[in-house]
Amino acid sequence: VHLSDGEKNAISTAWGKVNAADIGAEALGRLLVVYPWTQRFFDSFGDLSSASAVMGNAKVKAHGKKVIDSFSNGLKHLDNLKGTFASLSELHCDKLHVDPENFKLLGNMIVIVMAHHLGKDFTPEAQAAFQKVVAGVANALAHKYH
């Protein structure tokens, strides 16, 4: 992903103001609520029968933290997202058979949750930069599908 210095600064500033684990848990939870067909990949997570069940589910929160930790690592390697996410792309493609469109949906959830948590501090410039990043991450995760 090519980002200007201003975009990199906007990402760093915004990311520095949030609790990553909270962002991950809420983003994954929202994905499972808003796009319920994504729940099929999480059969072992127990009760996902309602929005409150999903958002309060400890396994959703734990996996959301794993997801956002990987995303956070990607923020440190913006010039090599395909390499950074190669093993996760292979896992999600070959073993889990996740539809790569879901990566785009999750990226959008991350942006929505960032906006929710940061309010006015999530400027249009920061959003534009994050949209580039989540698109780049989704593309990197879908790489093994091509």
UniProtKB/Swiss-Prot annotation:
Q: Which PROSITE patterns match?
A: GLOBIN
**Residues with the Phosphoserine modification:** 44
GO terms for cellular component = blood microparticle; haptoglobin-hemoglobin complex; hemoglobin complex
Q: Name one GO biological process term.
A: hydrogen peroxide catabolic process
In the UniProt record, does the keyword Transport occur? Answer: yes
Report the residues modified as S-nitrosocysteine: 93
Q: Which residues form the Globin domain?
A: 2-146
Tissue and organ expression note? Red blood cells.
Q: Which residues carry this modification: N-acetylvaline?
A: 1
Keyword line: Acetylation, Heme, Iron, Metal-binding, Oxygen transport, Phosphoprotein, S-nitrosylation, Transport
Modified residues annotated as N6-acetyllysine in this record: 59, 82, 144
Q: What GO molecular functions are on record for this protein?
A: haptoglobin binding; heme binding; hemoglobin alpha binding; metal ion binding; organic acid binding; oxygen binding; oxygen carrier activity; peroxidase activity
Q: Does the record bear Acetylation in its keywords?
A: yes
Q: Per UniProt, where does heme b bind? A: 63, 92
The record's family statement is: Belongs to the globin family.
Q: What does this protein do?
A: Involved in oxygen transport from the lung to the various peripheral tissues.
Q: How is this protein organized at the quaternary level?
A: Heterotetramer of two alpha chains and two beta chains.
The entry's protein name is Hemoglobin subunit beta
Species for this entry: Marmota marmota marmota (Alpine marmot)
Per the record, the gene is HBB
